[in-house]
Design a protein with these regions (language model features):
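Core catalytic lobe of class I
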Residues: 1-131, 139
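Conserved SAM/SAH-binding beta-strand->alpha-helix loop
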Residues: 135
């Protein structure tokens, strides 16, 4: 199993302690945002941590993925298409990690669906995505993005 978690520097020690205590291998990746906007801190918020936890994991060596620990992708600007979500992740970044840690037809789970970047990346890479999002607004954003990307109509299953 591979698990990825985006977090800030304050949560890093807690996640890494949990990982060691639970017997997971881990790696710390950095999402470098070249277009970060200064927000009054002593340094620009131009990185975000992406933690990788793994146990009995799949690795895909030899793909066209970027295996660097420093992943450079511009931040995604808020827009109506992504529901003005405050922490949109670039589809290319998510797709890169999915390529590394899964195979075609694998199942990818995202417990924090947000604007749906993981779902779109899975569609591009022929993976099955199971996603959870509690905020009805962002559920609609995810469905709309998926429908626009695939040209299909989502079906509500109530059972």
């Amino acid at each position: 199993m591979n698990a990825y978690v985006f977090c800030n520097k304050e949560l890093l020690p807690d996640y890494l302690d949990w990982c060691r205590d639970s017997g997971y291998s881990w790696n710390v990746l950095i999402w470098k945002k070249p277009t970060a906007i200064p927000i009054g801190d002593s340094h620009r918020p131009d990185i975000e941590y992406l933690l990788l936890f793994r146990k009995n994991a799949i690795w895909n060596n030899g793909t066209d993925a970027n295996y660097s620990r420093c992943l450079i992708y511009d931040r995604v600007k808020k827009s109506e298409d992504n529901g003005n979500h405050p922490t949109i992740k670039p589809i290319e970044l998510i797709a890169n990690e999915i390529k590394i840690s899964s195979n075609i037809n694998s199942i990818v789970v995202d417990f924090f669906g947000g604007s749906g970047s993981t779902l779109i990346a899975c569609e591009q890479l022929n993976r099955t995505c199971y996603m959870c999002e509690l905020d009805p607004h962002y559920v609609d954003v995810i469905v709309n993005r998926w429908e626009a990307f695939t040209g299909q109509t989502a079906e509500l299953i109530t059972e």
